Amino acid sequence: MNIRPSQIKHKQRIASFITHAVVVVMGVLIVSVLFQSYQISSRLMAQEGQRTSVQTSSLIQSLFDFRLAALRIHQDSTAKNASLINALVSRDSSRLDEFFSSVDELELSNAPDLRFISSHDNILWDDGNASFYGIAQQELNKLIRRVAISGNWHLVQTPSEGKSVHILMRRSSLIEAGTGQVVGYLYVGIVLNDNFALLENIRSGSNSENLVLAVDTTPLVSTLKGNEPYSLDYVVHSAKDAMRDSFIVGQTFLEVESVPTYLCVYSIQTNQNVLTLRDNFYFWMAFALISMIGVSIASRWWLQKRIQREIETLMNYTHKLMDLDTKSEFIGSKIYEFDYFGRTLEQSFRRLANKEKQFEDLFNFALSPTMLWNTSGRLIRMNPSAQIQFLREDAQNHFLFEILERQLLPTITNAAQGNNPSDVTTEVDGRVYRWNLSPIMVEGQIISIITQGQDITTIAEAEKQSQAARREAEESARVRAEFLAKMSHELRTPLNGVLGVSQLLKRTPLNDEQREHVAVLCSSGEHLLAVLNDILDFSRLEQGKFRIQKNEFRLKELVCAIDRIYRPLCNEKGLELVVNSNITTAAIVRSDQIRINQILFNLLNNAIKFTHQGSIRVELQLIEGDPLAQLVIQVVDTGIGIREQDLTVIFEPFMQAESTTTREYGGSGLGLTIVHSLVEMLSGQLHVSSEYGIGTRFEIQLPIELVEKPDAPQQLLPAPDPQPLFDKTLRVLLVEDNHTNAFIAQAFCRKYGLDVSWVTDGLQAIEELKIHDYDLVLMDNQLPYLDGVETTRTIKKVLHLPVVVYACTADGLEETRQAFFHAGAEYVLVKPLKEQTLHKALEHFKHHHGQKNAGLN
């Protein structure tokens, strides 16, 4: 068996790999240990150096403070001596000289560098050392003023023969014991420049090799003798480095009376211990490296000798396997890993041979037609099932395989190029096959493609029948929608007359019996209109044409509408209406106001309908949240209630809890269905609980966008007074083919003082507008000759007449509404026409088109 050439050119034996691994592991461990030791040692050395430096600095400061304290005590005791006071009072300079000479002889170590006595502003006596340091008399007078602040030590700087002299000075008062008067001031000073004795005294007590006293980097005095391996300039400019240098340079800024100064003491200490530790570390690192090399050489020799024979045994067995001698057995190895590897290899090749036989059997005995193709689209082999089905001719003497090949070849070629293959459906000799394509890849390259077919003739026929049924269902839904639209128009047209005439009759003088008849007429018409609206809303929901339109509105309007509309209805039935709300007048929200009203009104209508005594309670709570607030609506009644088993069906269309409920209370059974759908469209939640004979509770939670509240709450505008809106008579053209609807519309318009002209079709309307000027056109939709939408488009976009068009449609569909707007209409009214609806439309006309009519209020 030919072995594929390896891509790796340079190869090594396993002994070399193991040796390298051992060397690498040992090297990493040794280097890690050495590195860790180095880090720990460096950290310890740095900490030790820092500790030593801190101790040295503290010791230097303590010695410096001790020296100043000794001078302070000596000065204060001298200032209290009676002999000194008497000599000063008598102004006897010789006695003063003798006194201080005797004092210095007794305590020479505490003698200051210079000493003088002054009054408040003049020098009375000095020891003459000032001239020794080159300090002039007038400079001493300046020092008196600079040190006259307190009895503390002062660091002062004074000129002396072209250079600066830094002096520590202190003043003590000389007080006569008999009178208590201050007769003078004793000044003592320590000159820091070239004060070797002071610095040597500090060095001897600080365990330092040398000290340098400097102002910043300018040396004042040092203990260096000149034979050191470092210079004075290097000391004041060097940095601490315990691993590089043989000495450590510390830096201490002196404090005088706990006040930081610019005086700096550089201390030099030996660093020999650290250097010795570093040298030992380097030695052991070199020793570890040499040891690692020796261990590596010995390991390689031992591994080469120990495992060479075992490796040769394993290699010989692999050569046999490559020659397809799958029956040979591995004799075993003394090394566990090699033995396990050889036996695993033996087992793997046996499994591979078994799988090849199983695959061959599966290919040959599969009932599904299976074929193997190369990347050029040429057939390599096919199984017996494919041979039986395609290696024959049809009734027209066409070779079936050639027909199949033409249909499969484009997809096979596409799959051979690396594209994801998709299932292919072919039809051969009246049979439909679905083919699954699977590329066979070796080392990332596609070498062949296997196709497996499935006879889906029966499934294809079922799919065709399913598609036909779907088309029939869609057509049925479309026909039903058209029927509902036509029914809406046909029902709304007579309903417009019923409601319009009943509203007109309400405003005429009537006796009680007639008023009751008119009320029954209005109630019946409103009930029929509500049923019609429910059916149309359900149709739009079912077709997915119901849309949520969000706008900003004052939420308090919802509470006011409940009280205004439903309190009279509850009073008529003797029910108590309780409305509780935390909604303020200032709360402005953004949502679909119409749909929220529709949800609440449907629930209240049901509550009033099914409640005969007791109360109806409405709870409205606005709960602020982030990012959306929650509007919680609860409607609780004491009505007939719902049985538990019926709670699952009340939201189904055209369903009520019981069949007797429909007969007794009426209704379409769509109210709760519409409520449930609207709540879902508003992303809300609906919960219902009920106890039969006790009452029902509905709770709705709606997410709602809370607009930022204004600074001050605004009062709701009162309902408009139904009075004439215009100072002059507006000319209105009514386009309506139905005489009843035209009569109702004209009657309503005349109540507002409008001059109405009536035409019955779109062509007449166009001709009328060409001849006369009108302020407003009320346009019906379904007109003879030319419908309302086309008539509006001709008026607005063809003739460009400057007249306002308000559409009046009876179907109430969103498609009709949008069609009118696209044609150019400014407003759409839905029949049956009501006085309140017309009033709202005229208000819209007044506010949006008033600039064209000077006669508007």
Curated annotation (Swiss-Prot):
EC number(s) of the enzyme?
2.7.13.3, 3.1.3.-
Entries under Gene3D superfamilies matching the protein = 1.10.287.130, 3.40.50.2300, Histidine kinase-like ATPase, C-terminal domain, LuxQ periplasmic domain, C-terminal subdomain, LuxQ periplasmic domain, N-terminal subdomain, PAS domain
Topology of the protein relative to the lipid bilayer: Multi-pass membrane protein
Compartmental location: Cell inner membrane
Q: Which SUPFAM superfamilies match?
A: ATPase domain of HSP90 chaperone/DNA topoisomerase II/histidine kinase, CheY-like, Homodimeric domain of signal transducing histidine kinase, Sensory domain-like
Gene Ontology cellular component annotations, sorted alphabetically: plasma membrane
Instruction: Show the Pfam families listed in the entry.
Output: HATPase_c, HisKA, LuxQ-periplasm, Response_reg
Per its record, the protein catalyses:
ATP + protein L-histidine = ADP + protein N-phospho-L-histidine
**Domain Response regulatory: where?**
731-846
Q: What is its main location?
A: membrane
Return the InterPro entries for the record: AI-2_sensor_kinase/phosphatase, CheY-like_superfamily, HATPase_C_sf, His_kinase_dom, HisK_dim/P_dom, HisK_dim/P_sf, LuxQ-periplasm_dom, LuxQ-periplasm_N
Q: Which CDD domains match?
A: HATPase_EvgS-ArcB-TorS-like, HisKA, REC_hyHK_CKI1_RcsC-like
What positions are modified (4-aspartylphosphate)? 780
Using the record's annotations, give every residue carrying the modification Phosphohistidine: 489
Residue intervals passing through the bilayer: 14-34, 283-303
For molecular function, the Gene Ontology terms on record are: ATP binding; phosphoprotein phosphatase activity; phosphorelay sensor kinase activity
* Histidine kinase domain sequence ranges: 486-706
Keyword annotations for this protein?
ATP-binding, Cell inner membrane, Cell membrane, Hydrolase, Kinase, Membrane, Nucleotide-binding, Phosphoprotein, Protein phosphatase, Transferase, Transmembrane, Transmembrane helix, Two-component regulatory system
What does the subunit section of this Swiss-Prot or TrEMBL entry state? Binds the complex formed by AI-2 and LuxP.
| Entries under PANTHER family matching the protein | SENSORY_REGULATORY PROTEIN RPFC, TWO-COMPONENT HISTIDINE PROTEIN KINASE
**The protein's role, per its UniProt record:** At low cell density, in absence of AI-2 (autoinducer 2), LuxQ has a kinase activity and autophosphorylates on a histidine residue. The phosphoryl group is then transferred to an aspartate residue in the response regulator domain. The phosphoryl group is transferred to LuxU, and ultimately to LuxO. At high cell density, in the presence of AI-2, the kinase activity is inactivated, and the response regulator domain has a phosphatase activity.
Q: What is this protein called?
A: Autoinducer 2 sensor kinase/phosphatase LuxQ
Q: Which organism is it from?
A: Vibrio cholerae serotype O1 (strain ATCC 39315 / El Tor Inaba N16961)
User: Gene encoding it?
Assistant: luxQ
